[in-house]
From Swiss-Prot:
Membrane topology: Peripheral membrane protein
Superkingdom as given in the UniProt entry: Eukaryota
Family, as annotated: Belongs to the COQ4 family.
Catalytic activity: a 4-hydroxy-3-methoxy-5-(all-trans-polyprenyl)benzoate + H(+) = a 2-methoxy-6-(all-trans-polyprenyl)phenol + CO2
Protein's name in the database: Ubiquinone biosynthesis protein COQ4, mitochondrial
Compositional bias annotation for Basic and acidic residues: 271-283
Gene that encodes the chain: COQ4
UniProt-listed Pfam families: Coq4 (PF05019)
Cofactor(s) of this protein: Zn(2+)
Annotated binding of Zn(2+), by residue: 169-170, 173, 185
Length: 291
């Protein structure tokens, strides 16, 4: 059983931001710094090395918070990293086996509003992937700038693979025509688990439905899950897709190439607020260009 100090630490774990927690609470319970292995030095910017006990404690705390409060994106991200295990290496190997994937690992592109020309995508013809992505962002009210950076994967290349998965998640929603409400998010998690095999996606798919009412749970298991498992398992591994090179391609052509088809009709909720200002800025920019 955990001692009193460990219980206190676990309580603090659920209340502090990830970076703050890792530098304070987790360190307090670890082996004295003088006895720690030199391998605990950061391997890349933002890396937070953990020993086995810190990793286990973070996993337990992040799992608890991810279930009780799925809005804690930092905890969901931390759990994804601490449970990734050999799956991330397997995904890296898939990328290395693909010309497109190898180019991604060589270039290491990032997907944010500062690296992607959103104004250019908004001016692309309807039916192109770039225009579909912008339409999806605005319809859902989200931005690509809310993804947590990777902290707890030691190998820099594997850390990038996890970051790549994280930043491409919205593309999966977009190409599968899925919104971001809870039941649709879970459908995409089932798809990701079948397609990529990440344990975190499986955990979310397992425990997430507990938060749904009967009607939404029925839609998930009778319509969405069968589609997600069949489509995800038969489609090309999406971690190998260089999405940024495909903005001008037709979405329907990409679906055929990847072996993807639309999921069941989903419930589109009111857009979230995080992308409202971004959409307004793009609108003003377009008007200025016209006048």
């Amino acid at each position: 059983m955990l001692g009193r100090r460990s219980v206190s630490l676990l309580r603090g774990l659920t209340e502090l931001p990830v970076s703050s927690r890792a530098h304070t609470a987790l360190r307090a319970l670890s082996v004295p710094q003088t006895r720690r292995n030199v391998a605990t030095k950061p391997n890349y910017e933002g890396h937070i090395p953990l020993n086995w006990f810190e990793n286990a404690l973070l996993t337990a705390g992040a799992a608890y918070m991810s279930i009780t409060d799925p809005r804690r994106g930092d905890m969901v991200a931390a759990l994804g990293e601490t449970t990734a295990g050999p799956t991330v290496s397997w995904l890296r190997d898939q990328m290395l086996a693909s010309p497109e994937g190898r180019q991604i690992l060589k270039d290491r592109p990032r997907i944010t509003s500062s690296t992607v020309d959103m104004d250019k995508l908004a001016q692309m013809p309807e039916g192109t992937f770039g225009r579909a992505y912008i339409n999806w962002l605005e319809r859902c009210g989200v931005t690509p700038d809310t993804r947590e950076p990777v902290h707890y994967i030691d190998d820099p290349e594997l850390a990038y693979v996890m970051q790549r998965y994280r930043e491409c998640h919205d593309f999966y929603h977009c190409i599968c025509n899925m919104p971001v409400n809870v039941e649709s998010e879970l459908a995409v998690k089932y798809f990701e688990f079948a397609n990529l095999g990440l344990p975190m996606a499986g955990l979310a798919a397992l425990f997430g439905p507990l938060r749904l009412n009967a009607q939404k749970r029925n839609w998930l298991f009778t319509e969405a899950v069968p589609w997600a498992l069949k489509c995800g398992s038969s489609a090309r591994s999406l971690i190998t897709v260089y999405w940024e090179k495909r903005w001008e391609e037709q979405v329907e052509d990409m679906k055929k190439e990847f072996g993807i088809w639309d999921g069941p009709e989903a419930r589109w909720s009111k857009p979230l607020n995080e992308a409202k200002e971004a959409a307004e800025r793009r609108s003003k920019t377009t008007q200025n260009q016209i006048y």
